Amino acid sequence: AKEGENIIADGVNNDAVGINAFLPVLVDENRELLLVPGIYLVNDDITIDIPVTFQPGAIIKPRNGAQLTFNSEIRAGCYKIFDTEDDFYAEPEAKTSIKITGVNVRPEWFGATTISDVNAILNIADSSSAFRKVFRATTGDFKPINSTSYRSEFICKKIELSNGHYRMDKPTTHGFYKNGIFYKIDGGGYTGKGMGNSILVYTALQYEGNSFFDFSYGSWEMHELTGFKCTAYNPLEDDPYYARVGAIMLFGSTDSLITNEIWASGAKYIRNDPDGTRRGGVGIQFESLVDHSFCNLLIEHCINGIAFSSCISTGVNIKGFSNTISDFAFGNFIPEWPPVSEQTTSNIISISGLESKACGATPLFFGTNENNVVITGLLIDGRAEASLSTVTYQAIGISKSGGVHGSISGIAVNTNYGLIDDIGTGSAGSTGKTLYLNFVISGVYGSIGSEFSVINITNPQSRLNVILSLSNSSLPAMLSYSSYSTLSLSSLHVDGGTQDALIEVKSGNLIINSLDDSGSTYGKLAYVEDSVLIMPAIIISTNRNIIKGANGV
């Protein structure tokens, strides 16, 4: 570039005049712009429509409000090539000094750095500002759509992450809402080297905002984020892995979204709703998404793993490891949102393959009511992370105002209280919205003084159709107050509970379609009170007594 007249690259003299004069020559000769090492001060706008190669040490320095637009290829490695004064934390909607329309971009171009050893994360500079700058390079300036919405200037390219750990001292936001205006993004996303290779390490463990990584207000073109991890860590804190943030990652108010191979960990601060629902500490919160697909998500050492609120989403393969309350929840569990009991969201979710290991409560938890789900391949192992003790309370939990319908199938081993409990006011299905359960349950070890079962349905409005294989259980198979439910049961080594019965039916109707109960230790097949139990006559025998309580039929 120094071949061009008036291109000095000393960081003092304005090189914009020389570069603008040199570009037409390069276009006519079908040549690229080659920038050799030096500081190129730019005080006037430049638009470059040909490829640009930055040799290491070549840095463009826009000042005086100048904007540079790159409409073709940028050839540069993982080193700094832009020196800008943009502050998108102070003014996220401000004009950007650099616009890149032609290629994917790198945070390193704006000064981000990585380190291989996370324990030395504080030895490198904070990359937060570089991430804001590289994102705004992909959006250009925000342009008005109407009086309440602005949109990125062009379709965004992706941000390419390198191997290693990025130090992030501040949150990362993308689309946002400010002063009554939505600033939306059109396409773009992130592509990393793999969820264990490209890692954003957030160090502000005392931060209690909504999220560390917020990708919201995306629309029109496809948005794709794949192949990286977000985590919380600061070696100077008493607990270096304990973050108080509402969620590690938040994806909100977006359509056309793909989230693949993403790993989140470290959100550990619980805050209770007035009704006792435990929120906070979300690994990934999905909020108000349409046309969303996901694949290979890993959430570990959080309070709530993944949560869905007002989403239409389809995906495969979620892994939850050592999360305190849930691995897969429904509702918005970020504390700044209204209490779960006040949320009126609706989810339509399909997932194949959900693995839970060492969850401390209920791996699958329905906090809100209108959840229509198809979940297959749910695999739960309730043993602790570092021992054989059982820590998982129950496979499926429902809040006092929560509910679910659709179908769920899977296997759960080593739980304390079995499969599901509607706690009397939650909805495990409802009229016209049956919940279909098909499960293999093995190893139920809890004990309780009052009536309690592997399937515990005490809300008369719940409606279930259950196929259950149950073995090695200290609790009976089912307690039902449901007005109408059905059960097909195969059981082995199942205790009879307080009524010494495999099944208890109270204040409702239960149809048993099939029963294989060889080897169980209960004294009675069923106890029926204020309800009707219907089953094929062939099931009843001298060894299968049914005891009728008051008004039992």
Language-model regions, residue ranges each:
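All-beta strand scaffolds that present successive hydrophobic residues in beta-strands
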Residues: 52-55, 69-83, 102, 161, ...
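Right-handed parallel beta-helix/beta-spiral solenoid domain characteristic of secreted/periplasmic
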Residues: 5-17, 53-82, 87, 92, ...
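Interface-prone segments of viral and bacterial extracellular assemblies
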Residues: 24-26, 104-105, 140, 240-245, ...
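N-terminal extracellular ligand-recognition/capping segment immediately after the signal peptide
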Residues: 30-67, 132-189, 195-209, 230, ...
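Extracellular beta-strand/beta-solenoid scaffold signature
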Residues: 131-132, 170-182, 201-217, 226-229, ...
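Flexible, charged surface loops at secondary-structure boundaries
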Residues: 23-29, 45-48, 139, 148-155, ...
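Acidic Gly/Asp/Thr-rich repetitive segments characteristic of extracellular carbohydrate-active
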Residues: 3-32, 108-160
